[in-house]
Amino acid sequence: MSMGIAARPPRAALLPPPSVPRSR
């Protein structure tokens, strides 16, 4: 399982880029 998670992009990648302001 660890291998599968490692293969996937980091949690940060899932979230929108910092450039895009959060839907406030």
Swiss-Prot record:
Protein's name according to its UniProt entry: Erythromycin resistance leader peptide
Keyword Mitochondrion part of the UniProt annotation: no
GO biological process: one example: response to antibiotic
Region (Disordered) residue spans: 1-24
Function: This peptide is involved in the control mechanism of the synthesis of the macrolide-lincosamide-streptogramin B resistance protein.
Swiss-Prot/TrEMBL keywords: Antibiotic resistance, Leader peptide
Lineage: Bacteria, Bacillati, Actinomycetota, Actinomycetes, Kitasatosporales
Compositional bias annotation for Low complexity: 1-14
Biased composition (Pro residues): 15-24
Organism of derivation: Streptomyces fradiae (Streptomyces roseoflavus)
